[in-house]
């Protein structure tokens, strides 16, 4: 699994991405002191650790991730920080194994919004929440297709264009399905799934996050340190250097002697579970 290989470099290349997204998400869901929070797809703790500060000693924060090396590394960091209210465990983010009504807040940053069968996933999260509980998800603003996906001058589509579709269809059918239209769902699909699961006050906010790197090569290298690596690994090894060089040229030309930057459009979707009795 790609994410098993990422634990050592995930969110650690010097390009700030997961942490600023996490801070903004927490501002939106606003977990209060004393609440119990579940973070789905916790990775290296971008949401987990600042959430622990917000809920304080009277609350708890539980992180789950499907990648065992990620879980081990994040659990070790929680122990090093002396965070006794934080626990990290292996778990399937699409179907977390907790009793109903275990949490006041569920967050899933750059994870659940990308799951297939979002309506079913949203319904499972609703079951985990107590009445009036809050949910907050983040994901990419859905592009029409992966080939059209661009983070400003950083064209993810250039990597996707170098993938041989027939080879992917034979060996990675789930990823092959992403090569069609709306790989991350149609616009509004996440918000619609939350409403169908019984959430109210559902809001979707799109914001651009600027990515900065010391060099074009460093920014291209960042794409190997997160989920974008999935697409790189589908490119034949002898083609990767040429694709990377193309991306470096694009970024350098865009910078025109200034800072090397890209722009990641992030979708934040939040909601509140309808209180007991069904009255919003």
Swiss-Prot record:
This protein's record includes keyword Cytoplasm: no
Disruption phenotype: Mutant loses the capability to produce nocamycin I and nocamycin II. Mutant produces a new nocamycin intermediate, 21-demethyl-nocamycin I, which was designated as nocamycin E.
Protein EC: 2.1.1.351
InterPro entries membership: Methyltransf_25, SAM-dependent_MTases_sf
Catalytic activity as recorded in UniProt: nocamycin E + S-adenosyl-L-methionine = nocamycin I + S-adenosyl-L-homocysteine
GO biological process terms, semicolon-separated: antibiotic biosynthetic process; methylation
Entry keyword set: Antibiotic biosynthesis, Methyltransferase, S-adenosyl-L-methionine, Transferase
One Pfam family named in its UniProt record: Methyltransf_25
Source organism superkingdom: Bacteria
A single GO molecular function term of this UniProt record: methyltransferase activity
This protein's pathway: Antibiotic biosynthesis
Function: Involved in the biosynthesis of nocamycin I and nocamycin II. Catalyzes the methylation of nocamycin E to yield nocamycin I.
Family to which this protein belongs: Belongs to the methyltransferase superfamily.
Name the UniProt record assigns to this protein: Nocamycin O-methyltransferase
């Amino acid at each position: 699994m790609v994410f098993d290989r990422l634990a050592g470099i995930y969110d650690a290349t010097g390009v700030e991405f997961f942490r600023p997204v996490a801070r903004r998400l927490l501002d939106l869901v606003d977990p209060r002191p004393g609440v119990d929070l579940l973070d789905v797809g916790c990775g290296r703790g971008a949401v987990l650790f600042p959430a622990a500060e917000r809920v304080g000693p009277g609350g708890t924060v539980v992180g789950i991730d499907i990648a065992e090396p990620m879980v081990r590394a994040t659990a070790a960091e929680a122990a090093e920080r002396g965070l006794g209210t934080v626990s990290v465990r292996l778990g399937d983010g699409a179907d977390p194994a907790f009793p109903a009504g275990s949490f006041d807040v569920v967050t899933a940053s750059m994870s659940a919004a990308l799951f297939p069968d979002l309506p079913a996933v949203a319904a499972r999260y609703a079951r985990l929440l107590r009445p009036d509980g809050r949910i907050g998800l983040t994901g990419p603003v859905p592009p029409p297709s992966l080939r059209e996906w661009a983070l400003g001058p950083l064209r993810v589509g250039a990597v996707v264009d170098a993938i041989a579709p027939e080879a992917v269809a034979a060996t990675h059918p789930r990823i092959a399905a992403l090569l069609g239209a709306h790989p991350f769902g149609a616009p509004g699909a996440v918000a619609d799934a939350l409403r169908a699961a019984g959430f109210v006050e559902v809001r979707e906010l799109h914001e651009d996050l600027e990515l900065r790197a010391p060099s074009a090569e460093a920014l291209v290298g960042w794409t190997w340190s997160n989920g974008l690596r999935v697409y790189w690994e589908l490119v034949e090894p002898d083609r990767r250097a040429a694709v990377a060089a193309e991306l470096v040229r694009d970024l350098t030309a865009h910078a025109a002697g200034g800072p090397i930057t890209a722009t990641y459009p992030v979708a934040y979707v939040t909601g509140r579970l309808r209180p007991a009795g069904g009255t919003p």
